[in-house]
A protein has these predicted regions:
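C-terminal substrate-binding subdomain of Rossmann-fold SDR/epimerase-dehydratase oxidoreductases
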Residues: 111-266
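N-terminal Rossmann-like NAD(P)+-binding domain of SDR-like oxidoreductases, especially those catalyzing
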Residues: 1-106, 150, 156, 160, ...
Length: 266
């Protein structure tokens, strides 16, 4: 079993290094498939390609399924879409057992610190402990379908245990905005957060509106932003007998606990 998780996986960074992103996320997939074909390993291997909900981009349907049209809005999404289609192509042309998992956002305490969930939780924990004063965010109204990486890894494995290679959407089917996610974290940390202002002037306040701890920063907006992602994993639930064990509340609790542990250790 080959699980191709290798990628330049940051959407914002893909605008800065599009060629590198394409080389890793698109051509990297082709190289593995070519190796399977060249060494005549079609009967001995199963290949999993890590797709992404970012391929949907400017969503053409809500919620998104395996049949929803793709419309990526970043070099990352475009490169991943090549990986998706070349996997399908080699599956059909060379009978390679190749599957695409179209995974929506999945998080854990190990999430990279530049990704928004980790950034929010780490930033607010550090503010709680007096280590930082402010958290800077971009689009507060972007909506995502967040799940736990443990659930999604199980789904990846299940995909390659099937008799027939197919593609699957893996998602929770529940959606939250960056703003709501931030509110949830603040509540768990004991902050009485309130929002004031609009657009670039919007700020998050605590202490009955006396202290500003969150600001909107234009540097965290992308040239093109995906406003909404919401997955429909009905196929995975039926064919793989898969469903998520974790919800967003328990995921946030786990990530907060890890950040507090890191602060105490330092």
């Amino acid at each position: 079993e080959i699980y191709n998780l290798a990628a330049q996986s940051h959407v914002a960074v893909s605008f800065e290094v599009p060629e590198y992103t394409a080389n890793a996320d698109a051509l990297g997939v082709l190289r593995i498939l070519e190796a399977i074909k060249f060494h005549k390993l079609e009967k001995y291997t199963k290949f999993y390609q890590a797709g992404t909900s970012e391929m949907y981009g400017n969503v053409q349907q809500i919620p998104q399924t395996e049949k929803t049209d793709f419309y990526p809005l970043s070099p990352y999404g475009v490169a991943k879409l090549y990986g998706h289609w070349i996997t399908k192509n080699y599956r059909e042309a060379y009978n390679i057992f190749g599957c695409n998992g179209i995974l929506f956002n999945h998080e854990s305490p190990r999430r990279g610190e530049t990704f928004v969930t980790k950034k929010i939780i780490r930033g607010l924990v550090r503010i709680k402990f007096g280590l930082d004063k402010k958290l800077f965010l971009g689009n507060l109204d972007a909506k995502r379908d967040w799940g736990h990486a443990k659930d999604y890894i199980e789904a990846m494995w299940k995909i390659l245990q099937q008799k027939k290679p197919e593609d699957y959407v893996i998602a929770t089917g529940k959606q939250y905005s960056i703003r709501v996610f931030t509110n949830m974290v603040c509540k768990k940390l004991g902050f009485d957060l309130s929002w004031k202002g609009k657009g670039m002037n919007e700020k998050g306040f605590i202490n009955s509106g006396k202290r500003s701890i969150i600001e909107v920063d234009k540097d965290y907006f992308r040239p093109l932003d995906v406003n909404t992602l919401l997955g429909n994993a009905t196929k995975a639930r039926k064919k793989l007998k898969w469903k998520p064990k974790y919800n967003l509340n328990s995921l946030i609790d786990e990530m907060i606990s890890e950040e507090i542990k890191l602060v105490n250790e330092s």
